[in-house]
Amino acid sequence: MDASSLVKRGSSTHYANLPYGYYVLGVIVFYTIFLIVMRWLIPSRYTKVSPWKNKLLQSIRTASPCFHMPLLLLLVFVPFIHKYSLVAYISLYLKRLGRLSYVLVILNVLLTLRPANPILGYHYLDLIPLHKWLSRFVTVIGIIHGIGFIVKWSLDPKVSMISKATKLFNFIGVIAFVPLFILMFASVRIWRRYSYRSFYVIHQLGQWAMVFLVPIHARPRVTVPYFFILLALYIWRGISYIYYSTTVNVTQRVKDDTSLTYVKLDRSAIRDWLPGSHLRLSKYKKKNPLYWLMPTQPYTIASLPDESQIDLIIRENLTPYVVVGEYTVVDVYSTVPPSLLYDSQRVAIVVGGSGISFGLSIFKYLQTRNLDYLKFIWLIREREDMHILNHCNFETNDLEVYVTRSLPPDDTQTKSMNANGSSEFDDIDFELETMDESGALLTNDSKSPSLVHFGRRLDWQVDLAQFIESHALQNSWLVCCGPESLLTDGERYAKQNYCNFVKEFYDI
């Protein structure tokens, strides 16, 4: 009687996880609609409500993991333990973790569609932080699923762990488990910075193994509808990798023994793009398997679509990625809100180092619109980096450069908005030329900035004193590109002054 009872219990729970899988799929549908609606309803700039409400609203609108990951965890785990005892039915809940991990891959792939996300209406880079945290969560619960069964089989004297793990369907699960387990360590920030290429390859192999092997491993099957949804998303991604890609020639590369490199690409092969757009370059042809396996390199286009060339301004490692030759442009995508380009009236652009590539094309486009206020500030380490301006076709009247040599290592560090005291100057020796009353170098060269500040940090309140007008906040934009410290200062300034804010992270 006990044996028949056990058989009955086992058979009755075989399909017990199917409703939960459908529930998680419903959560994904609801969450997708939530993302779209919140992006449309919540204004992009801080408004004059309480600071915590502003912070909450922007966290929702920008898909910040700080808000969205707890929301997702709450939605998927509230009904996780239901009807069956956790202790008595541990196998059921381990299987449920595996099913949860697989179904959430649908959302994770959805977040990474590019060049622009056609479903959610976000820019590709907007969703990268959420994608990273969701990937970690999916990986961890997938690993818990695998390790949980290994421990269970090891502790059960009635079964052999080896024989269980080497059964066909279970062994396929083990194969899918291995790259996920390695990925958990390879995704650590230290390793990613040390060898992003190896991390990316492991990431690709891990996701392919999970998407295509788990449908064979899982019982009951996850083929319908989950695998077919993922297959459709992968086909969409594959088509975009082919349709949007094109071959391009790098025709010129100028280094000039400085930290910044100017690269010129042939214009004819690239479709039109918006100012501030990025492109991703691959060394491989589309027919080469490495095209699909190896990471691409993102660069920002510093020129406008109506120019005869494509300009890139990059900071390279010892081994340059881009040399004169042939490359594949995987896609071209924009992260700039259209309202900045078409509706703005007052714009301040603050960039550091190679971040000039992001700000430059926006600046050149806005120069054609006759705005009420336009200022472009570029923070660099060395005066010699200004050689880049000789290759860029634009009016430098509204450009100011801050040469920060002999200041702290972060070449784009700015003066805190809460700090008191005078700006710091170093002992840079330079030829005495015409200077304004603050000590800034005045130039008349059409290829030189209107003002060059030596050894001085940017003081947001002083140097942007004419930027903010209370009656024009809706159409006022602060654009920042550079390292985290610059973006943090810029975002703080935008919050305090209730203007629109666009940021782009460059680890320069």
Curated annotation (Swiss-Prot):
Coiled-coil regions listed in the entry: none
Record flagged with keyword Transmembrane: yes
All residue ranges annotated as the FAD-binding FR-type domain in the record: 241-361
Record's keyword annotation contains Lipid biosynthesis: no
Residues spanning the membrane: 18-38, 70-90, 100-120, 137-157, 168-188, 198-218, 222-242, 347-367
Any one GO biological process: reductive iron assimilation
Record EC number: 1.16.1.-
Subcellular location: Membrane
A Gene Ontology cellular-component term: plasma membrane
Membrane topology: Multi-pass membrane protein
GO molecular function terms attached to this record: ferric-chelate reductase activity
The Ferric oxidoreductase domain, residue ranges: 97-214
Record keywords: Electron transport, FAD, Flavoprotein, Ion transport, Membrane, NADP, Oxidoreductase, Transmembrane, Transmembrane helix, Transport
Domain of life: Eukaryota
Family note: Belongs to the ferric reductase (FRE) family. AIM14 subfamily.
Protein role: Probable cell surface metalloreductase. May be involved in iron or copper homeostasis.
Annotated protein name in UniProt: Probable metalloreductase AIM14
Chain's gene name: AIM14
